[in-house]
């Protein structure tokens, strides 16, 4: 099944999960999986939150990310992936002062 993110409406999520600025998402959700292409402009972030009933996979398409994962910090660049398993917590921050962070995320729903 093809999903064309260019055909999906981009929606602003202000202070998503308690983060800074707007998180922009183009989302496909079939009730079983949430599949998203996201954008964080400079100065924007997704706040620290836990995944108690699901997990999340984030693949960096372009830009630089700082990911807070439990007690650690991880730097991510294009081609790298972050995995937050069920029962863990994370945050995603655009680490660039000049370029947007583009990413692809999958959240399997239980």
What are these regions (language model features)?
Residues 45-47, 66, 82, 87-92:
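Histidine-centered metal-chelating micro-motifs
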Residues 36-51:
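Conserved short histidine dyad/triad with adjacent acidic residue
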Residues 72-86:
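Short acidic-glycine-tyrosine-enriched beta hairpin
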Residues 42, 53, 72, 88-89, ...:
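A generic "binding-loop/recognition-motif" signal
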Residues 1-32, 47:
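A short, N-terminal "cap"/entry segment at the start of jelly-roll beta-barrel domains
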């Amino acid at each position: 099944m093809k999903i064309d993110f260019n055909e999906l409406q981009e929606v602003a999520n202000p202070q998503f999960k308690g983060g800074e600025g707007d998180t922009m998402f183009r989302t496909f959700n079939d009730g079983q999986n949430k599949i998203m292409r996201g954008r964080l402009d400079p100065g924007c972030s997704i706040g620290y939150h836990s995944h108690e009933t699901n997990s999340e996979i984030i693949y960096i398409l372009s830009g630089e990310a700082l990911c807070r994962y439990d007690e650690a910090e991880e730097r991510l660049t294009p081609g790298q992936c972050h995995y937050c398993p069920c029962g863990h917590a994370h945050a995603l921050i655009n680490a660039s002062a000049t370029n947007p962070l583009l990413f692809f995320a999958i959240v399997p729903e239980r």
